[in-house]
Amino acid sequence: MKLEISRVYKSFEVPVYKQKDEVLPMSKIRIITDSASDISTAEEQKYNILILPFPITIGDKSYMSRVDFDNIGFYKLMEENPNELPKTAQITAFQFDELYKEQFDAGYTDIIFVSINKKGSATHDNAVMAKNEFFEEHPEYAGKGTIQIFDGVGYSGQYGYPVVQAAKMAEEGKKVDEITAYLSDILPKRRIYFGIYGLKYAAKSGRIPSAAALVGDALGVKPIMKIWANEIVTAFKCRGEKKLLAKMADVSAAEMLPGSPYQIVYGCDDVCRDELAAKMTEKVGYAPDDFFQIGAAVASNAGPKVVGVVFTVKDEA
């Protein structure tokens, strides 16, 4: 799939994924998300998912995630700019207005957008604002289709996995009501625990007090963060990497819906990824069904060396 820059906005270019001479697929449902979902390029292309990139600034330079670099390239930029905290910008209501027109013009009849945690970005609210005004401002599109917006309630594979499943459903010919019912049910039930190996970025972003980060690094203390119900909190603290992985596996296995699929999120460390996957497999009796390598949204606040488990919670958890 070739990336085509379709429009130029005030401060940056917004790429829209199109194919030259694109032929509309059998499904007229368009599944859209943003780059904080950390969906792999392979799944993006296989299931016809449209992923909107976030603009990112490091120092005095601006980039577009997934366009100017992949995840490894972003980690390298972080290493090259150790004193700069990457900053992400929102996707604007104007951009969503243009996006909706493009999708309807392409022949799609139902647009489903799943956004990054709405407490972490104004992107969700901008998508809703554009939707609420769209058919009034563009009456020529009235009756052409529907637009539905979902809060991803988290980051990375926490909503990236449900987006992939929704795209699979669309490819299988499921009706839009079935897909939206699935998303409405699953998104609030997704939880993630992830361990942070270096506290510098968490301190810079304000997730952890600077003094606590200095002491924690000196003592080898590794925090386990929980993302749940739009909130990010420090859930546990462990001393040493082995205890960190064991604790995450214990807690995740205890809280997840028995027999349900789970995923591993990770950054630059494949060894820790594989060790955590092995511990989870031992705990629950089956392997993770997907892996999500974190991009700018999580790495900017936690650093590139993180690893975690994302799962669907059981009712009482």
Where does each model-flagged region fall?
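Short N-terminal leader segment in a subset of presequences, especially plant chloroplast
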Residues: 8-12, 34-37
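Mixed-charge interfacial surface used for oligomerization/domain docking
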Residues: 23-30, 36-44, 49-50, 55, ...
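N-terminal glycine-rich anion-binding loop in soluble enzyme alpha/beta folds
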Residues: 30-95
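Glycine-rich phosphate- or other oxyanion-binding loops that anchor nucleotides, phosphorylated ligands
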Residues: 82-84, 90-132, 176, 180, ...
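Hydrophobic residues in alpha-helical segments
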Residues: 78-79, 104, 170, 203
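Short, Lys/Arg-enriched N-terminal segments with co-localized hydrophobic residues
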Residues: 9-25
